[in-house]
Swiss-Prot record:
Name of the molecule in the record: Cytochrome b
Single GO biological process annotation from the record: mitochondrial electron transport, ubiquinol to cytochrome c
Essential cofactor(s): heme b
Cofactor note: Binds 2 heme b groups non-covalently.
Organism: Pipistrellus kuhlii (Kuhl's pipistrelle)
Gene: MT-CYB
A Pfam family recorded for this sequence: Cytochrome_B
Keywords: Electron transport, Heme, Iron, Membrane, Metal-binding, Mitochondrion, Mitochondrion inner membrane, Respiratory chain, Transmembrane, Transmembrane helix, Transport, Ubiquinone
Molecular function as annotated in GO: metal ion binding; ubiquinol-cytochrome-c reductase activity
Length: 379
């Protein structure tokens, strides 16, 4: 008799996706982050669900409801900090996952890659709206500043901003709708993740060499399930260390002050995982130009498959491209640092140079280096 996991209509889908899935035999730990992202998403939905049971999306009570969760709800503080720091873990895994895709040429699976870019935008939108919900100073002013960027859109900008706000400023209507969307989006993300996986399983996984591995596949279970569990334990260790020892390390102290529309914080800045994009936004003195640069800093990922000039897929055997990749990584870390600094000399000029370098590496230098490497190898 054939095993039920291979015949049952529903279990068969799980089997083909996680158990009998043919996987390249040489994929490294960099391929762990997909499963970790799935676990992060599940954790965020679960902790978010329990937090939503006690949270109130009203400007008068939102801040105190979060305080109530931390003080009066059984293990509410664990839920709150797991959710807040879980978002940080989510973005760490996301950026490493995207970095892996860039390094090993996984972006040549165009459907999977583009789906991933859509997912990145969706997760960023969700995280932004979630940051507004505690209704602290940085929540309020972050929401005001970022939504106000849409007013840079010619002709319809101002109307669009007021439509999103539900009034003439960030207020009760804004908070309520942000809570509604913050609750809804993770479920949409879950559906998009399934499409992402569907596209991936059409082609099969890439591997560190970038060479097709159809002749050397092994089943996902037990070889990679055990490897994923190691990654999971490592992530849980880091997350619990954050939650239990320094839960506020990645947050902003200003968010422990209730939102006050009459008092602007000295330095308005988003959570750490948006600082690189925020630095790019601030480095352009023109409002519309800044908004375009902000969107393009992420949207640029869509054109990367079309800028691939090398005859080799992966960077494993391309030392020049490797140097550029790590230069890009250092550049992004520099932008992240600059995004958290005040707008004054020398931070402004450093941010502008780092922003120019970011776009220059991706659009110009990397494709040229790919051609140079082809020439050096006489291809």
């Amino acid at each position: 008799m054939t095993n039920i996991r291979k015949t049952h209509p529903l279990i068969k889908i799980v089997n083909d996706s996680f158990i009998d899935l043919p996987t390249p035999s040489n994929i490294s730990a960099w391929w762990n982050f997909g499963s970790l992202l799935g676990i992060c998403l599940a954790l965020q939905i679960l902790t978010g669900l329990f937090l939503a049971m006690h949270y109130t999306s009203d400007t008068a009570t939102a801040f105190s409801s979060v305080t109530h969760i931390c003080r009066d709800v059984n293990y509410g503080w664990v839920l709150r900090y797991l959710h807040a720091n879980g978002a940080s873990m989510f973005f760490i895994c996301l950026y490493l996952h995207v970095g892996r895709g860039l390094y090993y040429g996984s972006y040549l699976f165009k459907e999977t890659w583009n789906m991933g870019v859509i997912l990145l935008f969706a997760v960023m939108a969700t995280a932004f709206m979630g940051y507004v919900l505690p209704w602290g100073q940085m929540s309020f002013w972050g929401a005001t500043v970022i939504t106000n960027l849409l007013s840079a859109i010619p002709y319809v900008g101002t109307d669009l901003v007021e439509w999103i706000w539900g009034g003439f400023s960030v207020d009760k209507a804004t908070l309520t709708r942000f809570f509604a969307f913050h609750f809804l989006l993770p479920f949409i993300i879950s559906a998009l993740v399934m499409v992402h996986l569907l596209f991936l399983h059409e082609t099969g996984s890439n591997n560190p060499t970038g060479i097709p591995s159809n002749m050397d596949m092994i089943p996902f279970h037990p070889y990679y399930t055990i490897k994923d569990i190691l990654g999971l334990f490592t992530m849980i260790l880091v997350l619990l260390s954050l939650v239990l020892f320094s839960p506020d390390m990645l947050g902003d102290p200003d968010n422990y002050t209730p939102a006050n529309p009459l008092s602007t914080p000295p330095h308005i800045k988003p959570e750490w995982y948006f600082l690189f994009a925020y630095a790019i936004l601030r480095s352009i003195p023109n409002k519309l130009g800044g908004v375009l640069a902000l969107v393009l800093s992420i949207l640029i990922l869509v054109i990367i498959p079309f800028l691939h000039t090398s005859k080799q897929r992966s960077m494993t055997f391309r030392p020049l491209s490797q140097c550029l990749f790590w230069l890009l990584t250092a550049d992004l870390l520099t932008l992240t640092w600059i995004g958290g600094q005040p707008v004054e000399h020398p931070y402004v000029i450093i941010g502008q140079l780092a922003s120019i370098l970011y776009f220059l590496i991706i659009i110009v230098i990397m494709p040229l280096v790919g051609l140079v490497e082809n020439h050096l190898l006489k291809w």
